[in-house]
Amino acid sequence: MKKIIIFLLSLFVLTGCGRKEVTFDTTKEVTTAYTSEKLDVSDLPPITGMCGDEQYVYIAASPLRTDEKQKIYPEIYRIDKNNEVKQLSLPFEKEGTVYALSNISSSNEKSTFALLWRYQDQDGTAAYQIMICDEEGNVDQTISLQEISEELEAGVFGLQAFDGGFYIAGANSVLSIDQNGKKKEDVCQGMILGFTGTENGIACLRLSESGMSVYDLNEKKIIYLLEDREENGDMRALPSDHTLLLCANKLWHVENGTAALVFALGDIGINSEMVQTVCELPDGTLLLAARDGLDMNANQWIYICRVAGKNENTEGLKKTELVLGGGSISRECKLAVAAYNMQQDKVQITMKEYGTDEAGVKQLSMALTDGEIDLLFSSYLQDMEQYQGSLEDLSGGYENIAMTKPVREALTEAGSRYVIPGFRMRTFYKRGDNGKLYLYGGKEEVCDSFLYADVKGILDEENKKVDTNLLKEYIKTVEEMPEAEENTSLPELLKSDKPICGVTEISEPNDYMGIYLMGEQAVDYTGFEQKSSGQYVNEIVPVGVYGIVHGSKQEEECADFLYYLTGEEYQMKNAYPDYFPVNEKAQQRIWDIVSATKETTLPDGTQVNPYRCEVTYNDYEVVVEALDHEQLHSIKAWLDMPCVLYPQKKKYVELIEEEVIKYLEKQQSLSDTLEYVDKRVSIVLAE
């Protein structure tokens, strides 16, 4: 078990609780510090529940199945004040899952807790039971919940011992039961979005006819209403003093009708998608269990967040802070930053989005100039070009990894200032007898996609001329292309006798493995075999482009993050199935997965089964199966073909798109379109 790492969050909080209606204010300043610790529990199975008192924290976990015949029984662990972990031996005689835990006694003499678990009865029906246990795992009492099992099937979100019985948070109400498992009442009804409780108090967040509210279960009254549903719809916990709210992936402090932002989960290294469960200790400490993946080798942590009193010494190990900025930061980037932060002892990355409108672009440019950010992110290479002069030379950024061939070759064209953690492939087809592809998108995407495939023929940059005959052919191709999403469905499109022009974006190997319908006949189709008789181009679309800002005082730390992005550990866990990784070993892992012909276990512990998927379109079946050796060889050969990075939009490309779209929308004639393109583009080329 790794040692707890403590770091100081330079964050603030106000005290008190006020009127009934609460609004969320992300600009309101807070004034009391918070500290956060993290405990590495990666050696435990995925956590399903937690509770704790002054002596121990109790954890419920559910092992991952590694064999179809393996029986999965819940596991219970205890962590003491010295972070020593002990597994308790509880008499689980049936397979099942623990959904919630609750501390019962927090006295210094004896620690007891309760757990609520679900299992299958002998007749195959679902059964629920509460076990009351001591600190060694000895079961003092079992309580059958047969009477309310149907109500619990909709979901169980929390358990709290109180006044000799229990509160159970279900999906549509909070139930009160006695010590024998008999239902006493529905304490409150409505959609339950969050639940928390200690012996000091119990509350829930609910959505009812009166709106979104925090409800005190002991006093049976609304504490306050919440105005902005968007900000509180994903509540994880509510400390029992009612002055703190953990919801919408942020911690808020409530005072006088306003909830002030204290910190976002990302600030302490957690992405909301990683959070498994949350609980509150009697002293108000929040525990958040987070895991960065679903496989056996995923990292797992418990984050411990505390309020620091005004006179307390909050000095801890302060981390080096890096700021990653961008106009719009992608989900992949946010997950990468959260995963990186979870494993770091000395470095913390925070993210700042400036927006993609004109004002946001200006603010981002000023932040670069003023040295306010260390790392720059963009989803698209062309958006990074304008900031190239602000970025460090990263020509050595790929020297330490075995990189897949198309990325290595394409990067020589992109320059030396960018790091790309993964990529997708785009395949362009002009109209031809074999070019039957299904196109996603409307006029603008059609023009955009085909123009990159054709523009080198249409425009003669050296002689500053436009080939109007090729331009006319391009316009005709685009005009005749079916707009699949607007006018037709997949079966009708595939049954059409008319050749279909299109562009396909290859995000993962499964995109190659289709058996599609042409007419009513099922035929093999893979995105790389059926080249059209016209031009054929492969281009790499980067999945995230990163750069180190020139002048950053933490260049070494920034480089470490970029090495992490392109390294084996991160890429093998996160690349598939969203995109092709740049790391060769990570790519090989994908080949092992998609070509499996029998159940097997990869060296990293991943269970692999032969892949097969069936999808029905209007009674027509599309089947995807595992790749055979020949298909796999074809894909590898296709990936080794010469590739170029998806280019920056040049001004003349935008002009052509603009005029062609006007023609497609019947705003002008074909002859006028050819004339306008010729004139406008010639002026740009002359400049």
Predicted region positions:
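C-terminal motif of bacterial Sec signal peptides marking the signal peptidase cleavage site
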Residues: V13-G16
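Conserved N-terminal structural module of periplasmic/extracytoplasmic solute-binding proteins
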Residues: G18-G52, V57-Q70, P74-Y77, Y119, ...
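Short helices/loops that flank or line small-molecule/ion binding pockets
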Residues: V156, E358-L376, E483, N487-Y512, ...
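Hinge/lid segment of periplasmic solute-binding proteins
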Residues: Y380-F428, G519-Q535
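Short, solvent-exposed loop/beta-turn-alpha elements that line the ligand-binding surface or hinge
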Residues: S395-M403, G457-K476, Q530-V537
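Extracytoplasmic/periplasmic solute-binding protein
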Residues: E413-T427, N434-E479, S489-S507
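Extracytoplasmic/periplasmic substrate-binding proteins
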Residues: M481-Y564, Y570, D578, Q588, ...
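C-terminal capping/gating helix-and-loop segments adjacent to ligand/active sites or protein-protein/ligand interfaces
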Residues: L602-V681
